[in-house]
Amino acid sequence: MDRSANIPISLQATENKNDLFCTSHEINTYPLGHLLLMETAGKERERITELITQLALRGSFNLIAGDEWPPDRDTLTRSIRRYTVEVEETLDRPSLRRPMTCLQLLDLLMEVDMQRRPTLILNFFHHFYDADVDLSLRDRILEQCCQYLKRLSISNSIVVLVPRVSTVDYQRFFPILAAVANEIIPVEETYEIEVSQGLLF
């Protein structure tokens, strides 16, 4: 059976059974771009580090860290060194941005729109959970962010990771983001495949 990592072709490095979030889905050649939404169980730090490594081996891409945690340079160095001796060159390929508010996230998406590169976004909803910001404003900014994500996906592959949490806000926000995605992989499917096929770490 053909087993491929469920990462869009334009973001995908060489096939490897240890690639992040391998699934039984067959990967098609997506037209121009693709918006993939993936739920995760918590932060998934080791797996996300591996995903960033695989994308960096493939080429340059935008990396937007929604929360305070992207892997540090030492962690990425150790991960990349397992695959290539061109460590410094590979480390420079992710263009890391760290918005501090949902408004800054919107600004970053507008900037990324002009760069024409694949984009990986970690913990997309993080700043939308800020209760100090009026909910109606968060709703409005989220709608605008989703519009820009959809626009970005016309010409580039976009991967958005969202840790699933049992909150009212998550249940409110997730359908808005899901409505613009080309493909959604829920956390249950990821773990069913991990248990049944051993395709994940």
Annotate the PLM regions.
Residues T14-T29:
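Pre-Walker A adenine-sensing motif
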Residues R73-T77, D107-L108, A131-V133, Y170-R172:
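A short acidic (Asp/Glu
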Residues G33-L37, G59-I64, R116-I121, S155-P163, ...:
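Hydrophobic beta-strand segments of well-ordered beta-sheets in folded domains
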Residues Y30-D107:
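Conserved P-loop
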Residues D2-Q12:
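Charged, amphipathic alpha-helical linker segments immediately N-terminal to NTP-binding catalytic cores
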Residues P99-R151:
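Phosphate-binding/switch loop-helix module in NTP-utilizing enzymes
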Residues W69-P71, M100, H126-H127, V165-T167:
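Conserved nucleotide-binding/hydrolysis micro-motifs of P-loop NTPases
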Residues L152-F201:
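Phosphate-binding/switch region of NTP-binding enzymes
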